Amino acid sequence: MEINTTISNPTSTTAPHIDALLVRAHSLAAFATLLIAVLFGILVSLQFIFPDLIGIFPSWGRMRYAHTQGIMLGWLGNAFLAFLYYAVPILSGRPAGSRNLGLLLFALWNFAVMIPGWVLVLSGYSQPLEWAEFPLPVDVLVILAFLLAAIQFLPPFFKHGFENLYVSSWYIIGALVFTLLSYPMGNLVPEFVPGAAGAAFSGLWIHDAVGLFVTPLALAILYFVVPASTGKPIFSHFLSMLGFWGLFFLYPLNGIHHYIYSVIPMAAQATAIVASFLLGLVVIIVVSNLMLSQRGSGWIPQNIALRFASMSVVFYLIVSLQGSLQADMAFSQAVHFTDFIIGHSHLAMLGFATFAGIAGVIHAWQKLPDSSLNLRALDWSYWLLTIGITVMVVDLTLAGLVQGEYWQGTAPWLDSVRASSPYWLVRSLSAIPVTLGFVLVFYALLSGERTTASNGTQGSSANLNHESNATTGLSPALRMSYTVASVAGIGFFIFSVSLLGVIPRQTLSEETLALAPGPALSLSPAEERGRDIYAREGCSYCHTQQVRYTEADIQRFGAPSLAWEGRTDYPHMLGTRRIGPDLARTANTRTKEWHLAHLYSPRSVVPQSIMPAYPEMFGGSADRPLRDAMDLLAYLESLGRERELAWPEGDRRARELTDDERALMSLNTELLNAHPAMTRPRGSAPALPASSNTEYGLSLWRDNCSGCHG
């Protein structure tokens, strides 16, 4: 089916001015920051195998912060900006902004956001929020950078006229507008909205960072590179716009599926679940359109930019259907918090988005006059990256399934850690081809044959006159529909934030007022300092602080979290991953001496623990804690204290005030209303088989007991 497909043919013999300097600058910055971010990721992954390896480096959590922000803002941000400087003049027929504004944006993005942001998080100044780790001063600069990008790239489209825009233009406009709207929501709002209510806004940003920033710009690249490389129009302009509006209407509704079975109201969770399944259908439309647009190019296209774009489309289909599957409540119960989710995120950012980013940079770079490009190096990089990322994602997916199986049972937590070790080793090994692939792409841009002015920008310019002629037959009603849809899109974004952020906050506030046993217990100065240490070291990336409403969580960690428990948490630290156990009920479960020994040398207490040690918080031994260690201990001892003090009167009051006990997060006595710091009874211990021998008993002792008992 072809409807107005002539709009979608970015090939002609003329081109408006393209600022090659800014294309090159952002391209080189993209790969430089990518390699640094990958280095952080490798160091983070190696600690799963060698927990004491990075003692001379910043802590695991700090490097994890630097890794995620480096991938999203450093690598993808710069790659997308490089592509925009090339594509916007072609798509709009007008140059993008000004050279001076572009240089200011480049300096702001890299020398005021990325470098200071990395220095700050590695120095301990950060936010414990997923995809929002840079501290507030840097967040303000990021918002300013996005505003400058909008000023730089949006006016050419406005002057061009909405009714004649190609779909890549729409994705670019949508990304710039909606990222400006959503970034403050996930990076600023949780600092002022506590607990689960703040987590609702974080959940929206976790998904919008990918869905309204990364995905639209990646799809803009794919819809540009595919027809420019094949010399054919896209299969269907109608399907491309259907996919565009489906994405922007549904993505903002997905965020709360990151908190299924949490204390966030079930209505918000159900909305996100339904939207997640519908989004899967939209993705199938987008992917079908892009795949059919490549017909005749072969399974492995000869054009290297098209080859990366083609694999990006495949990754996009897999990761999107995987996301819809994860929204299923039964499946989420099994895999949430596991490495299955980490594999999913790597497939999104290092698979789909990264391959699209490479395709965009390569396509733009080879069209610039006097640019070098090593096609042999790019060919090797393609295969190394494809194999490496595939192995990494498959490995993490299997690890997540194994972890989920252990967590659903009654096996000790450490059993899941031991079972995960082989998968963590493979994950680190898979970083070798991935890193080599990225190095080769960077090398390819700096070596090889040079292009000439005659085969530079002219070879891929959009046929703007032809495109305009193709759209002059559109009816006034259809032209008006673009404007109506644009206004509706912004309105629907506001509606989604209200539905999944504002209304849940109000509901949680009402529940807190009705169910809280009394005024909130304020943290002491030492506990506040300890909370800051917990946040800066990234403890919430290993330990959640939410006991979900699942049988497995209740059996393992005790009574589920209630709305009022997080009413003083600014920002929340519910967490989105469990490498270690949940800590929401830590108070009074361990002795002071145990905690201090565990902080100083985790493996002296739990022999097979992979938790990082914090000897810098001590004066040379576990019995000589410095103030940081005592403050962190004070905070750990505060977790769950208020709930423990309120039991059982607080839960009885909750039952009296509501009929729908589970919906309002209250509990039933004896079945669920256990002491909140205690787990459910598990029955008699299984008898050892008659064939058990001394060697087996010794291994059990060594793995589980020797740390404390010598």
Predicted ranges, named:
Residues 546-579, 607, 618:
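Membrane-embedded segments
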Residues 211, 532-544, 567, 581-600, ...:
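C-type cytochrome heme c attachment motif
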Residues 128-139, 164-168, 197-207, 264-275, ...:
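Non-cytosolic membrane-interface motifs at loop->transmembrane helix junctions
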Residues 24-49, 60-92, 99-123, 136-155, ...:
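Hydrophobic cores of alpha-helical transmembrane segments in multi-pass integral membrane proteins
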Residues 1-23, 403-421, 448-488, 508-518, ...:
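Extramembrane terminal tails and long inter-domain/linker segments of multi-pass membrane proteins
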Residues 509-535, 547-554, 646-648, 658-700:
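Electrostatic cytochrome c docking/interface patches
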Residues 161-166, 198-202, 229-240, 267, ...:
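Hydrophobic, small-residue-rich membrane helices and short re-entrant helix-turn-helix hairpins
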Residues 150, 489-503, 592-680:
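C-terminal capping alpha-helices of c-type cytochrome domains
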